[in-house]
Amino acid sequence: MAISTLKTGRIAIIGASGYGGLQLVKLINEHPDFEISTLNGERSVGKNWNEINPFMKILGDKKITKSNIDEIALDSDYAILSLPNGLSSQLTPLLLKKGVKVLDLSADYRFKSLDKWKEVYTKEAAKYKRYDYDLCEEAIYGFSEEFSSEISKSRLIACPGCYPTASLSLLIPFLKQGLIESEGIIIDAKSGTSGGGRNPSEQLLLSECSESIRPYGVIGHRHTAEIESIASHFAGHQVNLQFTPHLVPMVRGILSTVYARLRDPGLTAEDCKIVIEAFYKDQPFIDILPVGTYPATKWVKNTNKVMISVEVDKRNGRIVLMSVIDNLLKGQAGQAIQNLNIMHGLESDIGLPKITFYP
């Protein structure tokens, strides 16, 4: 019996030359149900993909083109936008009008209020004029494990940021069930250098970041507002928390450690582990580790997994939650494909890696 090779979803990747775009190309090229219809990238217009990326050759090769909405609409069912903040909002309304469903990797539609986005992304708001209040309200936040029903019916997905994905995966089960105090939450997170993108940057030079770790964006990091927005949704009231990111000398990976006060100080680490296991039951990308086993970024490298561990400090009634993700996969392109699978009526884990190469 012949095996069907028909691919049913045509995907345009807009912004294919950055790290996020590279992951998308690899994942879609190897996906059993999707094919790459269009590759857009301002840096390499007119060049063949396989010519400039000999380490990631794709079947049939593709010429990188400028974004043309009419051409994308003719060739594509979905567009995944891996663009700088602000720029996505200039293309998304046009794509949606042409009937192309959009998954946006930027922060442009992560807030239900456009005014809130303008408050957080002030430089981008000054550069790009936006009036798409209705689309901000319509967009579904692409935290796949919690919003899959809404994602399946949506035409516009706002894919979460990398730090929010790692941190919210810990907070949501406990805020939604009222098991932790919403005041005094602290998030300490560490990310590899690929989180800074592919453009040259002095602070990401090997001689600058090797053998060194440093905090950045200590007060007012943009992901603070995103985390607070979603955390408040699940808590049912405003959540104000402390979030501090750190740059560590590795290429990919995020470790997020969350500290919060338990409402019931009698809960044990085993009790809290059961809470997380029940909340994420049957979710293929969430792994809950045994109490006393703490996650390492290498364990999820090159996968779409989230690994979670929990401890309880009986001295002060605090819960300590830990998660690791690959910032370029579960924190970016992998979660986008997970959402794309859901939108297309597939199992969420189709075509996504679950097991790392180790060491």
UniProtKB/Swiss-Prot annotation:
Keywords of this entry: Amino-acid biosynthesis, Arginine biosynthesis, Cytoplasm, NADP, Oxidoreductase
Cytoplasm as UniProt keyword: yes
Reactions that this protein is recorded to catalyse: N-acetyl-L-glutamate 5-semialdehyde + phosphate + NADP(+) = N-acetyl-L-glutamyl 5-phosphate + NADPH + H(+)
Subcellular location: Cytoplasm
Family matches, as SMART domains: Semialdhyde_dh
GO molecular function: N-acetyl-gamma-glutamyl-phosphate reductase activity; NAD binding; NADP+ binding
The protein's enzyme class: oxidoreductase
Descriptive protein name: N-acetyl-gamma-glutamyl-phosphate reductase
Taxonomic source organism: Prochlorococcus marinus (strain NATL2A)
